[in-house]
Every structure is written in C-alpha cells, then in structure tokens.
A protein has these predicted regions:
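Axial heme c-ligation environment in periplasmic c-type cytochrome domains
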Residues: 73-89, 94, 100-125, 145-148, ...
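Sequence/structural segment immediately N-terminal to covalent heme-attachment motifs in c-type
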Residues: 34-54, 60-68, 160-164, 174-204, ...
Length: 452
C-alpha cells in the first residue's frame, strides 16, 4: 500500500503508540469494578492499544510486535506497569506528554508511527482514566522487546521536532458549536482515540496526514494504501461507501464486523475484534452520525437506505446471473468464478446475509484501486470474532492455485457483473500484490497455467 514517505503500520492502523498512551505506572491491582479503571479500560479499547502492543508471546501490552514501515522495522514497546521493562515509572504528567507530544520519559522523541497527533485531542479526564488503567488495571510483564533500530538518518529521533512543527496541533478537541452533542462526540472519537484518519487519510511526502479533520480539507478520510491494504474512503463518495450506509448498518458493522451485504476484512477485522465491538451503542451511533456528515453536501439528510441493497435486489435478474445459473458463461474470468466462487457468493453475486458478503454493489469490488480485492483472493481473509457474532468466518486464499491471469480475469468479471461498474484488473496488478504479500500470508505463484 508505497513510494511515498508515510508512517504506515501493520495491523489496524498506526497505533504503535496508543500504548504510550499507556505510560501508566505501578503494578498494584485496582479494586474490583473501580470506575476510573473501568473507564480507562473502555478508552484503551477505543484506542485499540492492544493490537500493536501485543506481540508473538500473546501477553497483552507486553509489546514485541514487529511492524514494517518504509524506514525499517519498528518493534512495539512493553506498556505494562512493570518498572524495569514497562512504563511503571511514568508519572501521569510524563504519560500525558508521551501521548500528546510524542516524548518519552527519557526525553527522546517517539516516531509518528505512534498516532500522538490524534491522541493530543484527548480530554484531561480521559487522559487520567487511561493513566490509572495502565497503572492499576493491567498485569505487569517483565518482557523486554528488542529496541527499534531504524537506519540512519531515521535513527535520529530529534528530527521529529521539525515533523511536529508541521503536523502536531497541540490542545484537546474543540467542539463545533454549530453541531449537536452527538456529532461532537463522534468527531472526538474518530479524530482522537479512534485515530481513524491515520489509516483512512492519505499522507504527504513527509509522512503526515494531509488533513486531521473535516475542517482541513477534502483529503480527510479520503482513503489510503496501508501495509498492502486499501483503507477505503469514509467520505460521502460518488460510489457508495460506508458514509452512505444507514446509521444502523454502520453501528452493526462496527459492533460485529458484518452487515447484510458486507464484512470487515484485513486490518479492519482486527479493529472490530479488539476495539469497536466493545464500544457502547451510543458511542457507535455518534461515530456513525459524524462519519455520515464528512464530505456530505450541506443540509443533506442522513442516509436511511443502503444503496447496495437496490443493486443486490436486481442482481438475480442480471445477464451474468442468468449465464452462471445456466452454465453458459463466456470468458475465462467467468469460468474461474463458476469453479471457485459461485458456491458461496452465488450466481447472483448476492452471497448470504452476514455469512458470505455480497459482491453485487460492494464498495470494495467497485473501488478504483483493486489492491484489497486482489489480496483477499490471493491470501484470503477472516471476519472478526465478536461477542455478538463469535464465529470468525474465513475465506481461504486462492493464490496457490490461480495464476495472475486467472485472478485478473476473475476480478475483471466480478467488477463488471451484477450491476458493478469498475475497471478491469491486469495480470501486472495481481503480480505486484502477490510479490508484496508478507510471509504470514503467502500466496506463491502456481507452478503452471493451472485451471480449476
């Protein structure tokens, strides 16, 4: 997802330091149901701190997760209250400075991989609750992850002084008096702890987001490539996307990772599983209200019908559906679909509600950039496991059996069938994504021109 200088992290988005938002001290256990600790736990989940600060050992917040960036590998730190290996010696002021200004207890600068420009928007009350939680509500771990060692000149942390002058706006979130309390709550969560813009907003050559809020221009939440995935635009776009879903669909998606027509995949699946499923329905509703407004025409009413629904309803009568049902398909791509995809996603491309995502009218299918779509076909993806929907349904990868030509033909067929209106995919695009796949998600080229 990069030739430009951008801070892009693996896994739900540049959260390398949501956890320094965790610079809490002390390893003593808090009293059961302590309201401040529980509030901090809720906020830490809203910030998805655990995703980046839990490594191969699977010890929460003990760090050790290697994250690839254009500048080298960053290893997440231990943010448990262990005094030697973690953040147990941080005072509340030091914790807040790390979270808001990107400065460690020893005075060294943090890399912008940690989204401290977003966390700077936190209120003092929320900052305090986070500190108390990481001081008293997290089990200490003595694990010592290897230090981050970026090559020169990126190893010179003092360079972040200049970066901060360009991209760090100090001060908490300032409510918009012209908007409702719910809208402002949603903006606070999206711009702050949720740091949605760190994945969904394109970056400049210096690695900073081009806009940190809707007030700073149309780049905000306009979509960006991140670690081999396309974080889609969350703005009111020409092609139907999340911002044009009804409120209930947005809430359901953030709560369970699936709706009647689509499902979370890639890093977003992790965000739902570790973060948004735990948010209150009121906060999820506030997020939906805010997102529906970003990029929307002035005075536009909130969407009440998912635009994908009409496409899905008409898909069964489409020419592609008729030919697939009859087995009279034309073209290699349609044949690949019939032999590999039809059983789950059906001849109509409508899938099955909350189980197999519909391909008809799907915003991922219709995206201008097919990177995510190619990656899903090559390496597969899984839905999140949540309290409401515990089954982590998964699609297997087909990279082991389909050639680049196969995948290109398949996706070109899918992107022009059942009412979809997207451009073709080339074998070169597939080859590029296949080559960039991480070792954890291999999709080797088939040994020959295999046909399923």
């Amino acid at each position: 997802m990069k030739a430009v200088v951008a801070w892009r992290l693996r896994g739900a988005g540049l959260v390398l330091f949501c956890a320094l938002a965790l610079l809490a001290g002390g390893a003593s256990a808090a009293a059961p149901n302590d309201p401040t600790v529980e509030r901090g736990r809720y906020l830490a989940r809203a910030g998805d701190c655990v995703s980046c600060h839990t490594g191969p050992s699977n010890v929460p917040f003990a760090g050790g997760l290697p994250m690839a960036t254009p500048f080298g590998t960053i290893v997440s730190s231990n943010i448990t209250p262990d005094k030697a290996a973690g953040i147990g010696d941080y005072s509340e002021a030091e914790f807040a400075r790390a979270l808001r200004e990107g400065v460690r207890r020893d005075g060294k600068r943090l890399y912008p991989a940690m989204p401290y420009p977003s966390f700077a928007k936190l209120s003092d009350a929320d900052m305090h609750a986070l500190y108390v939680y990481f001081q008293q509500g997290v089990a200490a771990s003595a694990a010592k992850p290897p230090p981050t060692d970026l090559p020169w000149p990126f190893s010179m942390r003092w360079l972040m002084l200049g970066w901060n002058m360009l991209y760090l706006d100090k001060g908490p979130y300032q409510p918009d008096s012209a908007r409702s309390a719910e809208w402002n709550r949603g903006a606070y969560l999206v711009q702050g702890l949720g740091h949605c813009g760190d994945c969904h907003t394109p970056r400049s050559l210096a690695g900073g987001v081009k806009a940190a809020s809707e007030r700073q221009g149309d780049s905000y939440l306009a979509g960006a490539l991140l670690d081999g995935w396309l974080a889609q635009s969350l703005r009111h776009a020409t092609r139907p996307g999340a911002a044009q879903w009804p409120r209930d669909d947005l809430v359901a998606y953030l709560q369970t990772g699936r709706t009647a027509h689509t499902a979370a995949f890639g890093p977003m699946s992790q965000v739902v599983q570790n973060s948004t499923q735990y948010l209150s329905r009121e906060d999820l509703g506030a997020i939906a209200t805010y997102l529906q407004s970003v990029g929307a025409p002035a005075g536009a009413p909130a969407p009440t019908v998912n635009p994908q629904a009409a496409v899905v309803a008409a898909a069964a009568q489409s020419p592609a559906a008729s030919k697939l049902r009859a087995g009279t398909v034309e073209g290699a791509g349609a044949m690949v679909y019939l032999n590999n995809c039809n059983a789950c996603h059906r001849s109509s491309g409508t899938g099955a509600d909350t189980v197999f995502p519909a391909l008809a009218g799907n915003s991922v299918i219709n995206a201008k950039d097919p990177t995510s779509l190619i990656r899903i076909v090559l390496a597969g993806s899984a839905m999140p496991s949540t309290e409401q929907r515990p089954a982590a349904l998964a699609m297997p990868g087909f990279g082991w059996r389909l050639t680049d030509d196969d995948v290109a033909g398949l996706l070109s067929f899918v992107r022009t069938s059942w009412g979809n209106q997207a451009g073709p995919v080339s074998p070169a695009q597939v080859a590029k994504v296949r080559k960039a796949l991480p070792a954890a998600a291999p999709a080797p080229s088939p040994p020959g021109r295999s046909r399923p």
